[in-house]
Amino acid sequence: FLYKKRRTQTILDFVQNTITPLMISIGDAWSRNEIDIHHEHLCSACIERYLQSEIGKFLPRKGLPVILFSLPPGEHHLLGLLMVEAVLAERGAITINIGSHIPLNNLKLAAISCKSDVAALYFRFAYSSRDVLPTLLHFRRLLPLSIQIWAGGTGISVVRKKPKGVKMIFDLNEAVIALTEPLEL
């Protein structure tokens, strides 16, 4: 099913029109006790592996940023992060995904050693709303100003005032547009 759909869609369309509705349906089925949590995790794992294989097929384009992708400390659900990475990799960004469970100080070291232009953090809806802004502010203080921070995911909707030095990205289309904009330093 996924392979057939993907052949007829860009990654952006595939993520928005196939994966997202599928995962919402699975989450709804789980909340109604129609499936067990292991079914949801199995589906997520299959889609994660598929997206990782797709990301490996894309070639970077000159002039686009090097983006280090990670989840904030305490977050461990990778699917949303991989969906964003896949969309930007298809567009030609150089993507480096270091996953989850990385303390912010280590993310700083990774961003510097990978010569990243951008460090992107993905906040899920379930991430503690009281921790989103402090995490972003602390990370901004740690990183050199030459590295931009992009914050995305539904969890950032709780932030009322954009933190200085952080680009807030509210959907995949904004992420695609951000690739072509000059980096804010």
Each language-model region and where it sits:
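Long amphipathic alpha-helical segments
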Residues: 1-59
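C-terminal regulatory/effector modules of DNA-binding transcriptional regulators
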Residues: 34-36, 42-185
